[in-house]
């Protein structure tokens, strides 16, 4: 396009938009005029400022000229740049025309030479065929020797000359690969691929090579598998096997690298490659380890032989480990880390084997053997905790032999088995105890002089022994075992209490059958005290480890012990009452009034019982003596009140009061001689008899209200019925006095003080009936 055309086009475009251009000019001019007007109005705001109009005009003219010159300079440089660019475009167009002309000529020459390429392709095929034939001719001597080399290599394998056999095998494989490559053509060429028939022919001809590989591998893995057994005798075959494995591993890496490279991308991998004999080496070692361990007393792992089996495993592992560390480790490269691999194989086998053993129906001793071996022996310095092994491998990375869930299941199984055994032994011990109660001799006496039987010793030793054995495993298992033992003891004590009750029933049916009934009741109380001490000791062992998950302590055994002791003490008091009853019936008789032998006989019974109570351990000994005193006083007062006698004169009142006072003094003296404190809480039971005697012997009936108020202050549980019986016994109380006394009791009902044990609450007063007089000579 010419410059004139361009100028014409530009002019045409300018003619198309004259309005838009002039609008902008007009707008700019208006803005300029407005700015000038604003500026002038600010400068010439006063007439005297017009004098400087010439100066301002000259300055603005100079500024306008400067701006115009700068604009011209910028436009000129822009035009020069445009002119230079146009020149470069013209030169480039000329060069492109030359290149297009050369390409056209080259295309013409290529079309002329296309017929000659076909001739060259034929020549190339002839050349490839010639090379293959030349290779075949050069390989004929090798091909003739293949069969003889195969036979010779087989003999070497059979005689376990493994290194020589492997060298011959490598040579045969190299010949086979070279023949295949030569038949395929030069490397990197794009010629024809190997014919499948030719490849099959070569494979068949070298078929003996594959058999040699299998035979060599069989012998090789046999040597590796027997390495642990033959290491001390002759490690040479094992060393040869490792060297062959490393050679094969190097060949595998070579072929893999060759196929990864660009030049060997199209070359097929030799048959049977990669062999990965190093991985197979460790696999064979693992199988050999498993086979050796399975042969260690495997047939005798059930029953009592399980502990021996685990011990044999320990000795086998440590013996083989010593062989690996001191013999086989020097026969392999350092990067094999054979000791670490052996530990890993052992750990995997033990995980599987112990998982199988844990699934069996094991007895308590067998479970203990497994837990002790897993938690303590395996990680101890006798096995994997040896410092040299810890430096070689961190056992924690292998994981536990038995999972945490599996351990908990085993521990629960152990506790259940021990529970069954404990329950059976406790039942047998209870049966022996019941048999001992029927013996015609008193119970055994310990070195402290207390009655006892074999029951607490058996129970205590059994529970403590189970806790001690469980602690050898873990504190948690010890706590579980203790809790189980305490629960079983609670069941035993419930049966024990039932047996004591039945023992008492049989004695009440025929008291003459068992002469030592009381003695064995006292022995039962001592047994419970011993069991309580043992129970508290076991509970303290649990309390000393509050953080464990089994921190809940069963309180049932102590409550069961308390119930059993209370029942035995109640039966002891029933037996005392049974022996006192004939003497209590003689109270308020003429013999009692005249001679007083009844009270002496009662004291004799109390002495015999208290002597036996000395065979009881504290605090039950003191409790029995206090109950003995309490029972005697209560029964004495009950006998006085239930017979409802009436004194017909002051002499009779005096006689009755004197006898009661003498009885109270005799009881007090005998009780003190038997080291029984007369005070229970703040009340002296024997003082009650003397207090009742004082009320009966009171001369002035008008003073009864004062005496009754004093009696009420000491014995606040006395009722109107009891006081009414006392007034009836006097026989001389006016109705007004009786009414005032009973009204006073009705209005004064003091609360029972803390620690006060009611007496009159246990004494039931019979309904009113015809009273009888004192047994005087006239009445008789």
Curated annotation (Swiss-Prot):
The keyword Protein biosynthesis does not apply. InterPro entries: EXOC3/Sec6, EXOC3/Sec6_C. Its main location: cytoplasm. Keywords: Cytoplasmic vesicle, Exocytosis. Gene3D superfamilies: 1.10.357.50, Exocyst complex component Sec6, C-terminal domain (1.10.357.70). Disulfide bonds: none annotated. One of its GO terms (molecular function) is SNARE binding. GO terms for biological process: exocyst localization; exocytosis. It is found in: Cytoplasmic vesicle, Secretory vesicle. Pfam families: Sec6. GO terms for cellular component: exocyst; transport vesicle. Belongs to the SEC6 family. As part of the exocyst, may play a role in regulated exocytosis. This is Exocyst complex component 3-like protein. It comes from Danio rerio (Zebrafish). The lineage of its organism: Eukaryota, Metazoa, Chordata, Craniata, Vertebrata. The gene is exoc3l1.
């Amino acid at each position: 396009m010419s410059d004139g055309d361009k100028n014409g086009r530009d002019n045409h475009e300018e003619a198309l938009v004259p309005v838009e251009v002039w609008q902008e000019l007009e707008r700019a001019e208006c803005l300029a005029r407005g700015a000038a007007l604003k500026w002038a109005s600010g400068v010439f705001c006063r007439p005297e400022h017009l004098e400087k109009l010439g100066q301002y005009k000259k300055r603005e003219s100079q500024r306008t000229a400067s701006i115009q010159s700068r604009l011209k300079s910028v436009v000129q440089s822009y035009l020069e740049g445009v002119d230079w660019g146009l020149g470069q475009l013209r030169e480039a167009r000329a060069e492109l025309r030359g290149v297009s002309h050369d390409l056209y000529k080259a295309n013409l020459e290529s079309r002329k030479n296309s017929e000659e390429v076909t001739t060259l392709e034929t020549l190339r095929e002839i050349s490839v065929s010639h090379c293959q034939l030349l290779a075949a001719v050069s390989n004929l001597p090798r091909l003739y020797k293949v069969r003889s080399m195969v036979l010779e290599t087989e003999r070497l394998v059979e005689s376990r000359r493994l290194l020589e056999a492997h060298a011959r095998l490598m040579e045969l494989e190299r010949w086979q690969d070279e023949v295949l490559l030569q038949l395929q053509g030069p490397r990197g060429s794009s010629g024809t691929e190997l014919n499948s028939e030719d490849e099959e022919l070569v494979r068949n001809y070298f078929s003996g090579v594959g058999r040699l590989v299998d035979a060599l591998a069989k012998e090789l893995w046999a040597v590796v598998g027997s390495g642990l057994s033959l290491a001390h005798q002759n490690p040479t075959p094992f060393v040869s096997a490792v060297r062959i494995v490393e050679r094969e591993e190097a060949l595998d890496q070579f072929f893999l690298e060759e196929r990864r490279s660009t030049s060997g991308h199209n070359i097929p991998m030799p048959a049977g490659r990669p062999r990965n004999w190093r991985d197979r080496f460790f696999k064979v070692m693992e199988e050999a380890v498993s086979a050796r361990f399975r042969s260690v007393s495997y047939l005798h792992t059930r029953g009592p032989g399980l502990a021996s089996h685990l011990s044999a495993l320990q000795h086998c592992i440590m013996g083989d480990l010593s062989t690996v560390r001191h013999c086989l480790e020097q026969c392999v490269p350092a990067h094999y880390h054979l000791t670490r691999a052996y530990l890993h194989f052992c750990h995997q086998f033990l995980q599987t084997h112990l998982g199988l053993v844990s699934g069996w129906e094991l007895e308590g001793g067998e479970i203990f053997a497994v837990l002790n071996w897993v938690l303590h022996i395996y990680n101890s310095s006798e096995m994997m905790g040896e410092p040299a092994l810890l430096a070689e491998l961190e056992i924690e990375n292998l994981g536990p032999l038995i999972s945490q869930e599996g351990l908990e299941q085993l521990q629960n199984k152990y506790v259940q088995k021990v529970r069954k055994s404990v329950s059976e032994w406790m039942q047998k011990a209870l049966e022996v105890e019941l048999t001992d109660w029927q013996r015609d001799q008193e119970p055994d006496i310990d070195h402290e002089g207390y009655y006892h039987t074999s029951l607490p010793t058996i129970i205590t030793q059994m529970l403590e022994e189970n806790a001690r054995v469980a602690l050898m495993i873990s504190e948690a298992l010890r706590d579980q075992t203790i809790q189980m033992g305490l629960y079983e003891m609670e069941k035993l004590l419930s049966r024990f209490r039932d047996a004591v009750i039945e023992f008492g029933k049989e004695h009440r049916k025929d008291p003459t059958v068992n002469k030592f009934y009381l003695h064995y009741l006292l022995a039962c109380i001592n047994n419970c005290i011993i069991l309580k001490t043992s129970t508290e000791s076991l509970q303290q062992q649990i309390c000393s480890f509050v953080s464990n998950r089994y921190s809940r302590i069963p309180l049932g055994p102590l409550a069961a012990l308390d119930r059993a002791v209370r029942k035995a003490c109640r039966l002891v008091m029933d037996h005392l009452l049974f022996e006192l009853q004939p003497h209590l019936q003689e109270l308020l008789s003429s013999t009692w009034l005249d001679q007083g032998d009844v009270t002496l006989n009662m004291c004799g019974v109390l002495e015999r019982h208290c002597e036996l109570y000395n065979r009881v351990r504290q605090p039950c000994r003191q409790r029995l003596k206090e109950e003995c005193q309490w029972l005697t006083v209560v029964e004495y007062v009950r006998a006085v009140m239930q017979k409802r006698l009436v004194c017909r004169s002051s002499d009779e009142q005096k006689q009755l009061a004197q006898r009661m006072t003498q009885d109270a003094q005799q009881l007090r003296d005998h009780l003190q001689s038997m080291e029984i404190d007369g005070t229970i809480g703040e009340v002296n039971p024997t003082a009650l008899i003397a207090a009742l005697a004082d009320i009966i012997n009171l001369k002035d009936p008008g003073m009864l209200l004062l005496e009754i108020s004093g009696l009420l202050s000491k014995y606040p549980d006395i009722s109107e019925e009891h006081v009414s019986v006392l007034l009836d016994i006097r026989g001389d109380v006016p109705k007004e006095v009786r009414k005032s006394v009973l009204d006073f009791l009705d209005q004064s009902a003091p609360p029972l003080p803390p620690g006060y044990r009611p007496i009159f609450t246990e004494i039931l007063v019979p309904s009113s009936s015809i009273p009888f007089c004192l047994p005087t000579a006239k009445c008789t």
